[in-house]
């Protein structure tokens, strides 16, 4: 297990624009399995549900860096079971990811967008992001958080890996058990080495102007950063 006291950004194979589209799609499927196993939706849903009950109207949600769209699809399914009206849009910088996501459902509008370098469309109640923050430099992460906050009327939620030796070992094993994709098997452990510790994530939120943001650990291997507009 490498020394994880400090962050070490490791270029991930899925970020390579030259990655074969078929291999990219296999990796997206593997990542979706890991998301189901690790409870990405379970981290986000309680806050989304609470906001819906408070607003007493349909909630508009934007999911950023959505990948294959598995997280917003699962949120939509939970909302349907709870009889909560949820209107979702989702974006990703990758055209391959957007095409793959759109193939799975017509109930969510997917679009290509660089959420770090360009402002996000406005008018959303909540803006979410899962497993993307660790791909970014500190300055890029601050820009992303600021863009998310500017687009959100009420709430932003960022669900990401937390850097620790235990989490590195757990992700290494999970990637080999849950996926045969060589991209996932490389990128998973690399992601933990690139990840922020919870205290570092809170510092990024403060730099982005998110006064009152909170960061809480989530089992397994994650933290949830939340900020509510006051």
Question: How should each PLM-predicted stretch be described?
Answer:
Residues 1-17:
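N-terminal auxiliary segments of SAM/dcSAM-dependent transferases
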Residues 17, 21-47, 51-52:
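Class I SAM-dependent methyltransferase Rossmann-like catalytic core
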Residues 62, 68-117:
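Class I SAM-dependent methyltransferase SAM/SAH-binding core
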Residues 128:
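A conserved beta-strand element that flanks and buttresses the S-adenosyl-L-methionine
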Residues 136-147:
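A short, conserved alpha-helix within the catalytic core of class I
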Residues 152-161:
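Conserved beta-strand signature within the Rossmann-like core of class I S-adenosyl-L-methionine
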Residues 161-208, 214:
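C-terminal alpha-helical "lid/dimerization" subdomain adjacent to the S-adenosyl-L-methionine
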Residues 213-230:
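Core SAM-dependent methyltransferase catalytic element
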């Amino acid at each position: 297990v490498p020394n994880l006291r400090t962050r070490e950004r490791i270029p991930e194979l899925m970020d390579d624009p030259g990655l074969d589209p078929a291999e990219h799609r296999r990796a997206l499927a593997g990542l979706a399995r890991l998301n189901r196993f690790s409870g990405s939706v379970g981290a986000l849903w309680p806050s989304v549900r609470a906001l819906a009950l408070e607003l007493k109207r349909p909630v508009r949600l934007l999911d950023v860096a959505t990948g294959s769209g598995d997280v917003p699809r699962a949120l939509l399914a939970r909302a349907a079971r709870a009889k909560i009206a949820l209107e979702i849009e989702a974006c990703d910088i990758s055209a391959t990811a957007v095409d793959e996501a759109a193939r799975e459902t017509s109930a969510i509008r997917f679009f290509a967008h660089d959420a770090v370098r360009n402002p996000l469309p406005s008018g959303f109640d909540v803006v979410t992001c899962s497993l993307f923050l660790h791909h970014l430099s500190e300055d890029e992460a601050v820009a992303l958080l600021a863009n998310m906050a500017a687009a959100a009327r009420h709430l932003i939620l960022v669900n990401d890996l937390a850097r620790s030796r235990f989490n590195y070992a757990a992700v290494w094993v999970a990637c080999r058990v849950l996926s045969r994709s060589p991209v996932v098997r490389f990128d998973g452990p690399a992601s933990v080495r690139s990840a922020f510790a919870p205290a570092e994530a809170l510092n990024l939120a403060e730099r982005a102007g998110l006064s009152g943001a909170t960061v809480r650990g989530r089992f397994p291997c994650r933290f949830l950063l939340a900020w509510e507009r006051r």
